[in-house]
Swiss-Prot record:
Organism whose genome encodes this protein: Bartonella bacilliformis (strain ATCC 35685 / KC583 / Herrer 020/F12,63)
One Pfam family this sequence matches: Ribosomal_S14
Organism lineage: Bacteria, Pseudomonadati, Pseudomonadota, Alphaproteobacteria, Hyphomicrobiales
Example GO BP: translation
Annotated NCBIfam families: PRK08881.1
Keywords per UniProt: Ribonucleoprotein, Ribosomal protein, RNA-binding, rRNA-binding
Record's protein name: Small ribosomal subunit protein uS14
């Protein structure tokens, strides 16, 4: 199990990223638009830099829903390889069977 503080910190980052997503996207669009004047683009880039660091989606780490483990994460199942193996062998994941050949 991951530290509870690390999992909670990641949840706060997710919430902050959602809260600022629209504002961040709008400012990024202005910065990348070549038709907008250079001065306005510069103002937008400064405003973008003034946003909280944790409001960027890049700062959010994918974590296992079961254990909170940050590594060996399967996006499709939203869990780590270890939790997948345990739950799969117990038969809690539909369609997952032990392989034999």
């Amino acid at each position: 199990m991951a530290k509870v503080s690390a999992v909670e910190k990641n949840k706060r980052r997710e919430m902050m990223a959602k809260r600022y997503a629209a504002r961040r996207a709008r400012l990024k669009a202005i910065v990348m638009d070549q038709k907008v004047s250079l001065e306005e683009r510069f103002k937008a880039s400064i405003q973008l830099a003034e946003l909280p660091r944790n409001s960027a989606r890049v700062r959010v780490r994918n974590r296992c829903e079961v254990t909170g483990r940050p590594r060996a994460y399967y996006r499709k199942l939203q869990m780590s390889r270890i939790a997948l193996r345990e739950l799969g062998s117990l038969g809690h994941i539909p369609g997952v069977v032990k392989s034999s050949w």
